[in-house]
Amino acid sequence: MPKLKTKSGAKKRFVPKKSGKVKFRRAGVRHLATFGKTKKQKRHLRGTDHLAPMDEKKIKECFPYAR
């Protein structure tokens, strides 16, 4: 039986962790951030976050070998 493939779009955007949570980086900080957003908006977009439990289930299906 062939190996199952990971969804390429998911592996570029999400990182499944050993704890079972899925880490991601927030959208909206690539460009056009100098004049379109306030300092508060940019501050909240910084860093990474974990997915909500309902979204987590859908994304975990894209990673067949994640624990």
UniProtKB/Swiss-Prot annotation:
Any one GO MF term held by the record is: structural constituent of ribosome
Q: Give any single GO term for biological process.
A: translation
Q: Does the keyword Acyltransferase apply?
A: no
Domain of life according to the entry: Bacteria
Entry GO terms, CC: cytosolic large ribosomal subunit
Keywords per UniProt: Ribonucleoprotein, Ribosomal protein
Q: Which PROSITE patterns match?
A: RIBOSOMAL_L35
Region Disordered: list its residue ranges: 1-20
**The keyword Metal-binding belongs to this UniProt entry's keyword annotation:** no
In which family does this protein belong, per the annotation?
Belongs to the bacterial ribosomal protein bL35 family.
Q: What is the name of the protein in this document?
A: Large ribosomal subunit protein bL35
